[in-house]
């Protein structure tokens, strides 16, 4: 089982990348979200891997790569838990969700298809399908990139996301909610979630 590959980025395209590891080239499919974070070729890179086998007796092995652990965890959750979703479709969904893993998690837990539509572009049918499949399982996924976020940033991002989700539940548009919550939080960084929602409503 391959956990990650560390080597030199030999080539890259939206169809996939090749990493040279000690003279061996590994072809890896990646979502657009990972592709956009890649360095220029000939630079070192670390990619987290998912192996997939197909064909009789598992004769064909495909590698799927992700820039962060959270991208990989979300991909595996979707592929394994959402009925009828194969590897390629799971990659497509992961790319959409990578806009904000925290907001996606909040939308699933709060059973909010409108939030899934406005932020990530999922149709109502797909949003409902994701909610049913993931509502009892998504809490096990760590959506915080600990290598890049401090504790203060984590608290801020979580609170802001939850407040925005709360306003959307009350019928406000995503853009309205984001502007209100962001403006209120910038002037009240020690605020509680309940007061953040109340003051955001006053702002609106």
UniProtKB/Swiss-Prot annotation:
Keywords in alphabetical order: Cytoplasm, DNA damage, DNA recombination, DNA repair, DNA-binding
A single GO molecular function term of this UniProt record: ATP binding
Record region (Domain II): 68-149
SUPFAM superfamilies assigned: DNA helicase RuvA subunit, C-terminal domain, Nucleic acid-binding proteins, RuvA domain 2-like
Subcellular location: Cytoplasm
Domain III as annotated region, ranges: 155-204
Pfam families (alphabetical): HHH_5 (PF14520), RuvA_C (PF07499), RuvA_N (PF01330)
Membrane-spanning ranges: none
KW DNA damage (keyword) present: yes
Chain intervals for the UniProt region annotation (Domain I): 1-67
GO cellular component term, pick one: Holliday junction helicase complex
Gene Ontology terms: biological process: DNA recombination; DNA repair
Domain of life (superkingdom): Bacteria
Flexible linker: annotated segments: 150-154
InterPro entries: DNA_helicase_Holl-junc_RuvA_I, NA-bd_OB-fold, RuvA, RuvA_2-like, RuvA_C, RuvA_C_sf
Quaternary structure note: Homotetramer. Forms an RuvA(8)-RuvB(12)-Holliday junction (HJ) complex. HJ DNA is sandwiched between 2 RuvA tetramers; dsDNA enters through RuvA and exits via RuvB. An RuvB hexamer assembles on each DNA strand where it exits the tetramer. Each RuvB hexamer is contacted by two RuvA subunits (via domain III) on 2 adjacent RuvB subunits; this complex drives branch migration. In the full resolvosome a probable DNA-RuvA(4)-RuvB(12)-RuvC(2) complex forms which resolves the HJ.
Family note: Belongs to the RuvA family.
Domain notes for this protein: Has three domains with a flexible linker between the domains II and III and assumes an 'L' shape. Domain III is highly mobile and contacts RuvB.
Function: The RuvA-RuvB-RuvC complex processes Holliday junction (HJ) DNA during genetic recombination and DNA repair, while the RuvA-RuvB complex plays an important role in the rescue of blocked DNA replication forks via replication fork reversal (RFR). RuvA specifically binds to HJ cruciform DNA, conferring on it an open structure. The RuvB hexamer acts as an ATP-dependent pump, pulling dsDNA into and through the RuvAB complex. HJ branch migration allows RuvC to scan DNA until it finds its consensus sequence, where it cleaves and resolves the cruciform DNA.
Protein name per its UniProtKB record: Holliday junction branch migration complex subunit RuvA
Organism: Endomicrobium trichonymphae
Gene: ruvA
